[in-house]
Amino acid sequence: MKLTTVTNVSVDGVTQGHRRIDAGPRHETDAPDEDGSGTFERFGWAPPLLDDAASTFISQTFQRADAFLFGRRTYEIFAGSWGAGMDPGNPVGEALNTRPKYVASTTLTDPRWADTTVLSGDVAGAIGELRAKPGGELQVWGSGTLIRWLLDRRLVDEIVLLTYPVVVGQGTRLFPATGPDLGLDLVDLLSTPKGLTIQTYRTTGRPQYEAATA
């Protein structure tokens, strides 16, 4: 399966707190799990900028997934929002409740959401086995710490960025100040009436650099 990450990000690269629901209790922070809120205060910067075009893209992206991969904190947020009792006619809820879900976590032992498998121990090996399966798409939503962990191990095939026209000015960013370098090919670019840009990139290994002059 192709491993695709889908991330809501501000112009200054912040991923943290894009919805108010993210202002929950702090959970484990050890990679490959998701980070907590810390001292971040500027929650909910994304919903005012969502429009019908962005919502349609999000729904269609969820529907094309064959399976989902989460860090623990994002998994628990999604389970609380989209788990039992969700309107079966909701396309996002339908996708999440009918596809297999995988959680990269060293502490989660009793997942309550149906069709969930916890990946512990050799997480990279388990994800590699999922990627080796023919066809399909394994999607990672949110889960910023997990995404950085995956990028560091070059386990990501495509990166989708929903970039919101806002500078948040604080918070955890998708790409750290120091991390792996990565070449990208732009395979799709969309814009919405409220100014979101949605970029889809295919990873190409390490980037090329200008040769040093004599």
What kind of region is each of these model predictions?
Residues M1-L155, P165-A214:
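Portal/gating segments that form or line small-molecule/metal binding sites
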